[in-house]
Amino acid sequence: MRVVDTHFHWFPRSHFETMANRGSFPRTERVGDGYRYLYNEGRGFIPLPAVWFDLDAGFSASFSATGPDTVVVCTTGVLAGMLDQMPAEDALDEAYAYNEEIARAQRLHPGRFFGTAAVPLQDTAMALKVLDHAVGSLDLRGVNLPSMIGSETVDASRLEPFYERVAELDVPLIVHPTDLAFNEVLTGYADGIQRSIGRLLDSSVTVLRLIFSGIMERHPTLRVVQTHAGGLLPYQAGRIDKNARIEGLPRLPSEYLKRVFVDTVAPQSLTIRTALEYYGADNILYGTDNPCWSPQAAVSVLDESALSDEVRRKIYSTNAESVFRLT
């Protein structure tokens, strides 16, 4: 059985080098044989050891857990927010360069590696131009959405043409935490609050904005993929329906939420079982967060979840093949 890891991180080293040469934030700085990413005017940073740009090491870790037929879908992850903190022209150049490198890896590893696009959302026209190139010319299989675009949220009305175009192109919109929201109250404890709860809050609010704003209502074919088993949302769906009656929405928020696809990056089987019960087996995608989490650990959690053969096949393979058009 082909296994599709939908939550895999790899970056071309050229991207980190370009960001290291920037004179202002966001940027990276060289640390030994790796880097660290500095954002929010330098108040936040993420260590980026060499494994982040070692694709062979990423493949090796995946194969050791799920065998040589493993396929990876590469997402920008936390760094999706990097472009949207930059001046628009700089972001345009870097988005093109990044997407070209991701597409190059896809060509070098056909059927093994699939890439997703970064776009400069601070300028809608630029974002549309980059999106069309990434999907139409480079054959990338999705587009990444940060939690914030500068000081704007993802439901800014000017972004409506972007969501319309994503739906028309029939590629998924990937919502991964970007550490750009709520930073003032998530500090301290060696980033323990940010990394444990903050990132889930970040992506959960992003998805709620897509729902409350009517974006998912206006674009019923838009496929949204939320990482980390749906963050906080499946556990509070009843409260969301109770407290958030949105004028103009013909359905309860939870009805849109159940359209969302979520991955299995969650270090306990209880979370997986809850996600399965809430979203249904057709909406769950296998993911490892490699290199941030161990593929072996990701498999162990699913093994502990007592899945039927049919559900395992959907999670490990067929759902992702459909969402990312891999067949």
Predicted regions, residues:
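Helix-coil boundary/capping segments in enzymes
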Residues: 1-327
